[in-house]
A protein has these predicted regions:
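N-terminal accessory/interface modules of nucleic-acid-binding and processing proteins
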Residues: 1-316
Length: 316
């Protein structure tokens, strides 16, 4: 089994702990405090102010969407081509070893309290709220291209996929169906009809209707991409955190296109064009760029969640 196959099989160790809601909230607050005081993390956040840095983060997010935002920024800053990351111990559990000359990627992770600290707490008879919970630290992880197999690894069986035009057409039909279903769930109707002029789609806030161009020269793949973009704009307006951001036309366009970029990649329909951040965006502080990225992550996550369940069968 290759490193990619091992990770895709659901065997990737996570750098982030699973916990209840109260612990997650505490963990988030602690992460924000630690990240604000850490030079490497701040460099990674500041990189979002440039078009190149923003694009690097979008590519990393498409591969590591389940990792927290701060860790996505760190990976994009240190190794933007990373696709699957795990600790050295994690890779060994999968049958791989990290090569000796490889530099680690530093990411935030919760390190559990030592056994001795927990034993001391028990012996002292201290109350539950004083139980040692561990610490938040920058820990080393490695990408899949930094490891080699331990011993002989069997070659994965290559599945034969039928080459037929109908397969691609069926995927597009399924994608459009999932998008239309999601739109109806948030109170938005979708209509396809010819549109005169250069505009290929639009959203009418007063009626809650999205209209997508159905002209013969606007193929189904382009219609799906435009529908994702229009839905992104709807969700941007609905997002509670959006009110804390002053989105001018340039900033809003970048956020919407970034969402469409991420969701398109999730649906297997990547976008080739680069996304250029506005001049004013680049002049703002890294904390503002962080809030833009968080908005993209939230909105894209909603659309990706709606699509994944319906598209998993098509991607197998």
């Amino acid at each position: 089994m290759s490193a990619v196959k091992a990770v895709q099989a659901g065997q990737r160790p996570s750098a982030m702990p699973s916990s209840n809601g109260r612990c997650r909230s505490k963990y988030k607050r602690e992460l924000l405090e630690r990240a604000a005081a850490d030079g490497l993390t701040q460099e990674a956040v500041e990189a979002l102010r440039s078009s190149d840095g923003w694009q690097r983060w979008l590519r990393v997010r498409c591969q590591l969407a389940t990792h927290g935002l701060h860790n996505q920024f760190l990976v994009a800053h240190q190794r933007p081509g990373a696709r699957h990351v795990a600790s050295q111990q994690g890779w060994r559990s999968l049958g791989y070893e990290v090569r000796s000359d490889e530099a680690p990627i530093r990411v935030w992770a919760h390190v559990p309290a030592s056994k001795s600290a927990v034993c001391d707490w028990r012996r002292a008879g201290s109350p539950p709220e004083e139980k040692p919970e561990g610490d938040l630290r920058l820990v080393p992880v490695f990408d899949q291209d930094q490891v080699s197999p331990l011993g002989e690894v069997p070659k994965p069986v290559q599945k034969k996929h039928p080459r037929s035009g109908s397969s691609e057409a069926n995927k597009l039909i399924r994608l459009l169906g999932q998008l239309i279903k999601f739109a109806s769930e948030i109170g938005v109707s979708v209509n396809f009809e010819p549109i005169a002029g250069v505009v290929r789609g639009y959203h009418e806030p007063g009626t809650g209707e999205i209209v997508i161009d159905a002209s013969p020269d606007f193929p189904p793949a382009a219609r799906a991409a435009r529908l994702i973009y229009e839905l992104a704009n709807v969700l941007i307006d609905e997002d509670p955190g959006r009110r804390r951001l002053k989105l001018c036309n340039g900033e809003r366009e970048v956020v919407a296109r970034s969402v469409a970029w991420c969701v398109g990649a999730c649906a297997g329909r990547g976008y080739a064009e680069a996304i250029v951040v506005p001049t004013q965006w680049a002049a703002d502080s890294g904390s503002v760029a962080f809030r833009y990225a968080a908005l993209v992550d939230r909105v894209a996550g909603r659309l990706e969640g709606a699509l994944l369940s319906g598209l998993e069968g098509e991607q197998e």
